[in-house]
Amino acid sequence: MSNKELIKKFYNEVFTNRDLSNLDDYMADDYRQHSPEVADKKSGFIAFIKQFWQFNPKIEMLAVTSDENIVQVFFKCTLKNGHVNKVCDIYRIASGKLQEHWDVIEHNVEDKKTVSGNSIF
C-alpha cells in the first residue's frame, strides 16, 4: 500500500467511520505529535479524537499529496456548530505506519476573504 493510500484509509476509518479498532495497523507505538493540543503516542491521539468526535465533524478531503515518506492532507472540516475549518495535516510515514504529525489549521474560514480573492485552499 502506498503512503497516500495508507493515509486515505486511515482517514476513512478513523475520521469518517469513527473506528479505532485498526489503529495499530496505521499508527506507530511511538507516534510523535507536534499539534499543540494533542499528546504524543497513540494514547494522546485517542484522547484527542474521542473529544473531537463530540463536535460531530464532517470531513471533506480536498487533496492528498506525498513526497517519499511525507504525506500532506488538505481537508475541510465542518463542525456541528456550523464552524468550518480548513486543515493541512502533515505526516511522516516510517515502516508503513504514521510516525509523526504536524498540522496547520485555519479556524472558521468560510466567511473570510483573502486580499488576493483566492480561497484559502
Predicted regions and their residues:
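C-terminal and inter-domain tail/linker signature
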Residues: 1-121
